[in-house]
Amino acid sequence: MKLNKYIDHTLLKQDAKKKQIDSLLSEAREYDFASVCVNPTWVEHAKKGLEGTDAKVCTVVGFPLGATTSAVKAFETKEAIQNGADEIDMVINVGALKSGNLALVESDIRAVVEASGDKLVKVIIEACLLTDQEKIVVCQLAQKAGADFVKTSTGFSTGGATIADVRLMCETVGSDMGVKAAGGARSYADALAFVEAGATRIGTSAGVAILKGELADGDY
């Protein structure tokens, strides 16, 4: 199994330096990862750094709280794509979901999907904050809104991906959508377990260590 093609090689820390981003890009070129995932401010730099490779540039929208308005998320999406983003990982409005305002949750996702054009949209549900029923509901809403993936976590909340969450999300969306496990893979065994549970993408800062079969010390 080519695990490298499952990995979104990630650096989303707010204090990330240019040299760290450059290292991320160099590793993506060397290990042929599916994508790099960086904050919007680094998208243009990442696009230039990955020219001539198959690696995509993934960025985040409404990150990490999901509490900006739909209009702001749509603008972020459009600007990111103009700057070279190939994939958008957006955070849902968790508060709206918890309040039972499902129409707002769906329209919020749809705003990003519509702004993204033909680019891939992954919907971060922040599973660690949700009940199982809420996880099911929001995955269904993401599917209804036309998103391409559901994603477990930002990596900035109280927990990351779990095998149980990945299985539940896969069962909910079926084969129509991808499932991204983020914030829980720190070793080759972890990554393999997520793939075996149904994950089609893994978000991690430990991509190199995973491929080397080493235990990583990163949180995301």
From Swiss-Prot:
Metabolic or biological pathway: Carbohydrate degradation; 2-deoxy-D-ribose 1-phosphate degradation; D-glyceraldehyde 3-phosphate and acetaldehyde from 2-deoxy-alpha-D-ribose 1-phosphate: step 2/2
Enzyme superclass (EC): lyase
Catalytic reaction annotation: 2-deoxy-D-ribose 5-phosphate = D-glyceraldehyde 3-phosphate + acetaldehyde
Single Gene Ontology MF annotation: deoxyribose-phosphate aldolase activity
Active-site feature positions: 89, 151, 180
Entry-linked Gene3D superfamilies: Aldolase class I
Biological process, per Gene Ontology: 2-deoxyribose 1-phosphate catabolic process; carbohydrate catabolic process; deoxyribonucleotide catabolic process
E.C. no: 4.1.2.4
Keywords: Cytoplasm, Lyase, Schiff base
Record's subcellular location: Cytoplasm
Record bears the keyword Cytoplasm: yes
Keyword Transmembrane among record annotations: no
Pfam families: DeoC
GO cellular component annotations of the record: cytoplasm
Function: Catalyzes a reversible aldol reaction between acetaldehyde and D-glyceraldehyde 3-phosphate to generate 2-deoxy-D-ribose 5-phosphate.
NCBIfam families: deoC (TIGR00126)
UniProt-listed HAMAP family: DeoC_type1
Family: Belongs to the DeoC/FbaB aldolase family. DeoC type 1 subfamily.
Descriptive protein name: Deoxyribose-phosphate aldolase
